[in-house]
Swiss-Prot record:
Family: Belongs to the jacalin lectin family.
Documented applications: Can be used for the isolation of glycoproteins from humans, plants and fungi. Is a powerful T-cell mitogen in the mouse, and can thus be used as an alternative to concanavalin A for the mitogenic proliferation of murine lymphocytes. Identified as one of the several suitable fluorescently labeled lectins that can be used in a combination for the visualization and quantification of extracellular glycoconjugates in dental supragingival biofilms grown for 48 hours in situ in the absence of dietary carbohydrates. Used in lectin-based microarrays to detect altered glycosylation in cancer tissue.
Protein name: Jacalin-related lectin Calsepa
Expression across tissues: Rhizome (at protein level). Detected in the cortex and the pith of rhizome. Not detected in vascular tissues, pericycle, endodermis or rhizodermis.
Subunit text: Homodimer.
Pfam families in the cross-refs: Jacalin (PF01419)
General function of this protein: Mannose-binding lectin. Preferentially binds mannose at concentrations ranging between 5 and 25 mM, but also binds glucose. Has a marked preference for methylated sugar derivatives, such as alpha-MeMan and alpha-MeGlc, at concentration down to 5 mM. Binds to N-glycans, but not to glycolipid-type or other type of glycans. Binds N-linked high-mannose-type glycans. Has a preference for smaller (Man(2)-Man(6)) high-mannose-type glycans to larger (Man(7)-Man(9)) ones. Recognizes both alpha1-6 extended and alpha1-3 extended monoantennary glycans.
Domain Jacalin-type lectin, first and last residues per copy: 6-152
């Protein structure tokens, strides 16, 4: 049996911050969007997957800057649901070109948009039969770039 080949879409954004990558063994089942700056500014993303033993595999990107977290929103991805696409915008926030809004699309529905739809739009291809199995990008104080690891189901 052939091992599935993952492809990469993106990353979209800029070259600031440090590279990060999250490719869990099991599917991503929760995403937390953290806001800061006294408003609807997404400054951090947390991706989680549940391992076979029940423990969590988690990464948080962004959120290390001078802004304190003022709120969060949680996306729970159901057992019959899987990620198929992302879209959003990158724009200027405190003199940085960073993630300003994001929508997570699954085989069942769209979650979002989260944040403010300002700046330059981006979108991953929503290819039928593809599942997002991980994320990659760049981050420092904020999310500077984001892309996806995709696998044909």
């Amino acid at each position: 049996m052939a091992v599935p080949m993952d492809t990469i879409s993106g990353p979209w954004g800029n070259n600031g911050g440090n590279f990060w990558s999250f490719r869990p063994v099991n599917k991503i089942n929760q995403i937390v969007i953290s806001y800061g700056g006294g408003g609807n500014n997404p400054i951090a993303l947390t991706f989680s997957s549940t391992k076979a033993d029940g423990s969590k595999d988690t990464i948080t990107v962004g959120g290390g800057g001078p802004d304190s977290i003022t709120g969060t929103e949680m996306v729970n991805i159901g057992t019959d649901e899987y990620l198929t696409g992302i879209s959003g915008t990158f724009g200027i926030y405190l003199d940085n070109n960073v993630l300003r809004s994001i929508t997570f699309t699954t085989n069942l529905k769209a979650h979002g948009p989260y944040g403010q739809k300002v700046g330059t739009p981006f979108s991953s291809a929503n290819v039928v039969g593809n599942e997002i199995v991980g994320f990659l990008g760049r981050s420092g104080y904020y999310v500077d770039a984001i892309g996806t690891y995709n696998r044909h189901k």
